[in-house]
Amino acid sequence: MSNKDIRVVVGMSGGVDSSVTAHVLKEQGYDVIGIFMKNWDDTDENGVCTATEDYNDVIEVCNQIGIPYYAVNFEKEYWDKVFTYFLDEYKKGRTPNPDVMCNKEIKFKAFLDHAMNLGADYVATGHYARIHRHEDGHVEMLRGVDNNKDQTYFLNQLSQQQLSKVMFPIGDIEKSEVRRIAEEQGLVTAKKKDSTGICFIGEKNFKTFLSQYLPAQPGDMITLDGKKMGKHSGLMYYTIGQRHGLGIGGDGDPWFVVGKNLKDNVLYVEQGFHHDALYSDYLIASDYSFVNPEDNDLDQGFECTAKFRYRQKDTKVFVKRENDHALRVTFAEPVRAITPGQAVVFYQGDVCLGGATIDDVFKNEGQLNYVV
């Protein structure tokens, strides 16, 4: 089968990465369709809907490339699967990662299903990751060539079935090369700045946004031995290891968030970047997913490396099944500021094995009060 007989539906955001993704596939001779996903009603404070601006860029790019385009609305699916999860996690005092859930439930489920209904053989996105297809048909996901842009951390929940239908055309090149291609082709998005922050918040103030959905409950900010250091403006606004926004003055080292007590609405703080309370030995994680589950013996356990947040250096770990629903991830050396609600993502070299959601954090066999 030649490329012209293979239909690839590209998820287009109106950014440079997805624009170049569509261009590269078109150049390679595939039957390419562009689809713009509207996942959130994101009218800004000035009454301007940024999604409309992005869709106009998609239209212009698709016309430049010479491919058909459509818009599809996933606002209900996004609210049900991503945003309610986001709010529920904050209610529990955790720090969620909505991008992981968006990839799992929207971009590579709702969008993938929609594309298959359009007769697609594959979907493609502008993620910085790579797919390795083996002769027997199974696939592996590898880090993107550009280390600064690698996005496998956010793709850790994707299954073998999902990834077998996915292409990441720009995963083999650097971001600077993506920009160069866009400029060379005269694409309207060539100089458009990258989107930052959580997809549905955009450039809005995080505190202001969150307070629209969850009422803030101010409370005491104390040290672990009970010394009152001030007031917090609501536990949901703070994450483990956070330094800024505490409002604690005085001499000496800066102060950091080391824990939360939901029952008493207390924020725990301690002084010093390397304070002992910020370090842990192992964690328990649930909702785990592996691209190739049969390759990992969870009963015996296995060694690999892991990331506990995006753009963090890999840490050597030992992964073993804790029970039917959870994994125990033991660190080769203590790790700072592990945060419940965030993803722990596993690697063997460049291969992303999968990931899980961090639940509880331990040191010396005792659970830390990161979130209690």
Swiss-Prot record:
GO terms for biological process: tRNA wobble position uridine thiolation. Coiled coil: none annotated. Keywords: ATP-binding, Cytoplasm, Disulfide bond, Nucleotide-binding, RNA-binding, Transferase, tRNA processing, tRNA-binding. GO terms for cellular component: cytoplasm. The active site is at C102, C199. Its main location: cytoplasm. It catalyses: S-sulfanyl-L-cysteinyl-[protein] + uridine(34) in tRNA + AH2 + ATP = 2-thiouridine(34) in tRNA + L-cysteinyl-[protein] + A + AMP + diphosphate + H(+). One of its GO terms (molecular function) is ATP binding. The record marks H127, Q342 as: Interaction with tRNA. It is found in: Cytoplasm. InterPro entries: MnmA-like, MnmA-like_C, MnmA-like_central, MnmA-like_central_sf, Rossmann-like_a/b/a_fold. Disulfide bonds join C102-C199. ATP binds at G11, M12, S13, G14, G15, V16, D17, S18, M37, G126. Its EC number is 2.8.1.13. Residues 149-151, 309-310 are annotated as: Interaction with tRNA. It comes from the Bacteria. Residues 97-99 are annotated as: Interaction with target base in tRNA. Catalyzes the 2-thiolation of uridine at the wobble position (U34) of tRNA, leading to the formation of s(2)U34. Belongs to the MnmA/TRMU family. This is tRNA-specific 2-thiouridylase MnmA. It comes from Staphylococcus aureus (strain NCTC 8325 / PS 47). The lineage of its organism: Bacteria, Bacillati, Bacillota, Bacilli, Bacillales. The gene is mnmA.
